[in-house]
Amino acid sequence: MKDNDIKRLLYTHLLCIFSIILSVFIPSLFLENFSILETHLTWLCICSGFVTAVNLVLYLVVKPNTSSKRSSLSHKVTGFLKCCIYFLMSCFSFHVIFVLYGAPLIELALETFLFAVILSTFTTVPCLCLLGPNLKAWLRVFSRNGVTSIWENSLQITTISSFVGAWLGALPIPLDWERPWQVWPISCTLGATFGYVAGLVISPLWIYWNRKQLTYKNN
C-alpha cells in the first residue's frame, strides 16, 4: 500500500466534504431566505445533486481501468441505466423501511422520500460509482475480509457511518425540547450528513494508521 494512494483517497474525500459545504452556502446567493432548517427540502435536493456530481467526477478519475469490452459505448449506456434503476430502488427501499419504522405514511411522504434520497446519495451512489451495478461486488465488499483496495475499505466506513448517523439523528425526535431541527426528518438527515462527513474524515486516517496491517487479495 503506497502513501500516495492514501493521499489521493484523502483529497478525494476532502472534495466530497467541500461539495456538502458548497450546498450550504452557494444556494443562499441565488435563493432568498435559504437555510438548512427553513428550506430543508430544497437543501436536501441541492446537497444530493452536489454530492452525486462530485462522486461521479471523482470516481471516473480514480476508478481502476476496466477492460476494453467494458469501455464500449453500449456497455456504458447500459451500465448508466442500471445505476439509475439501482438508485431509484434504493430510494424506494429506504422509504419503505422508514415507514415501517414509524415515519408518517402519507402526511410527510415527500419529506420521508427526500430523506431516503439523501441517504441513498451517501451510501448507494458511492457504491455505484466504485463497484457499478454489481450486487456480487457489493456483497463481497460488505462481507468480512472481502475488500480488495483502500477505496473499498473507505466505502465500508462511510456507508456504515452514514447509517449510524441517521439512526442517532432519530433519537432526539421524541424528546420535548421543541427545537426546529427535531421536526421529521431534519435531525435524521443532519445525522446522516454528519455521519457521512465523519466517515470521509475517519476512513483515510484509519487506513493510514493501520496501513501495515491491511492486506488485500489483489496485492
UniProtKB/Swiss-Prot annotation:
Changing P172R: In OORS; defective GPI anchor biosynthesis in homozygous patient cells. Disulfide bonds: none annotated. It is found in: Endoplasmic reticulum membrane. Pfam families: PIG-F (PF06699). Coiled coil: none annotated. GO terms for cellular component: endoplasmic reticulum membrane. It is linked to Onychodystrophy, osteodystrophy, impaired intellectual development, and seizures syndrome: An autosomal recessive disorder characterized by global developmental delay, impaired intellectual development, seizures or tonic posturing, dysmorphic facial features, and hypoplastic terminal phalanges and nails. Belongs to the PIGF family. This is GPI ethanolamine phosphate transferase, stabilizing subunit. It comes from Homo sapiens.
